[in-house]
Swiss-Prot record:
Main location: membrane
Membrane topology recorded in Swiss-Prot or TrEMBL: Multi-pass membrane protein
Protein source organism: Streptococcus pneumoniae (strain ATCC BAA-255 / R6)
GO molecular function: membrane insertase activity
A Pfam family that the UniProt record links to this protein: 60KD_IMP
A GO cellular component annotation in the UniProt record: plasma membrane
Residues where lipid is bound covalently (S-diacylglycerol cysteine): 23
Protein name: Membrane protein insertase YidC 1
InterPro entries named among the record's database cross-references: YidC/ALB3/OXA1/COX18 (IPR001708), YidC/Oxa/ALB_C (IPR028055), YidC/YidC1/YidC2_Firmicutes (IPR023060), YidC_ALB_C (IPR047196)
GO biological process terms, semicolon-separated: protein insertion into membrane; protein transport
Length: 308
């Protein structure tokens, strides 16, 4: 199970890097971005950055901030929807803690591979019985829809004409900036900490805790080898993600918690068929034994009456 989680985390990181660089092609001779995503989304973003920077005289740093905020606001509903699904899953796990916790305890205390497999099957069966997805309720579609925007603005912040020679608050945008790297790491760490808010299920908390360090570490590593213009985009993105997390924690989660509790009040959850320590229902008959003994006693008395 642990090896699967490690593989999933590594695959997620590799996939993010692949998508960020793969959505937009780069011409090998000129080093400039090309392709459908760039022409459709990236180039207009670059023009918007240039418009705010030169036509409005705001400078490239402020222009990158403005365009990043606009793009983030456009895709915010997708991010909220993605978080809504994950939060709904989390609240179901919290509400059904009394059903799932025994299986999770068995899984932790299992010593043999057979016991672990049996405990996993019991846990998956209990989750399936109560409509809880084993994948955390997070669909791929909202993430895939957002990725072209992330990729396009990543290249727009880096390749917009004039940005490499500009500076923002004394920071050259064409070379890496340790100040912005530190800011990006702190912001993504805070966002990861906020994602723990309201999560009561122990297994979920453990999974989120692993990601708390993964996401900031990835951003820091990428930022160390990226120009400050790109890191500035990630800093603004970190602020927007914290805003999104506040919306989820204090608006979305309370509503979903109320909804889940109302549904459970109308349809109280039944104990799982795999809730006994052995992983099976206890079907040992009790009453028939007493009936059998009465029948035997009656037959014994009947025999005595015949002998008389």
């Amino acid at each position: 199970m642990k090896s699967i989680k490690r593989f999933a985390l590594s695959a997620m990181g590799a996939a993010m890097l692949l998508v960020l660089t793969g959505c937009v092609n780069v011409d090998k001779t000129t080093g400039q971005p090309t392709g459908f995503i760039w022409n459709t989304i990236g180039a207009p973003m670059a023009e918007a950055i240039k418009y705010f920077a030169t036509d409005k005289g705001l400078g490239f740093g402020v222009a990158i901030i403005i365009v990043t905020i606009i793009v983030r606001l456009i895709i915010l509903p997708l991010g909220i929807y993605q978080s809504w699904k994950a939060t709904l899953h989390s609240e179901k796990m919290n509400a059904l803690k009394h059903v799932l916790e025994p299986h999770q305890t068995r899984l932790k205390e299992a010593t043999t591979q057979e016991e672990k497999l049996e405990a996993q099957q019991a846990l998956f069966a209990a989750q399936k019985e109560h409509g809880i997805s084993m994948f955390g309720g997070v669909g791929c579609f909202p993430i895939l829809l957002q990725m072209p925007f992330f990729s396009a603005i990543y290249f727009a912040a880096q390749h917009t004409e004039g940005v490499a020679q500009a500076s923002y608050l004394g920071i050259p945008l064409g070379s890496p900036s340790m100040i912005l790297v530190a800011c990006a790491g702190v912001l993504y760490y805070l966002q990861s900490l906020l994602s723990l808010h309201g999560v009561e299920d122990e297994m979920q908390r453990e999974q989120i805790k692993k990601m708390i360090y993964m996401s900031p570490l990835m951003i820091v590593v990428f930022s160390l080898f990226s120009p400050a213009s790109v890191t500035l985009y990630w800093v603004v993105g970190g602020f927007m993600m914290i805003l999104q997390q506040f919306i989820v924690n204090y608006i979305v989660r309370p509503k979903l918690r109320k909804k889940v509790h109302e549904e459970l009040a109308k349809n109280p959850s039944k104990a799982s068929a795999f809730s006994t320590p052995s992983g099976r229902k206890d079907v040992t008959p009790e009453q028939p034994t007493a009936i059998t003994s009465k029948k035997k006693h009656k037959n014994r008395n009947a025999g005595k009456q015949r002998s008389r």
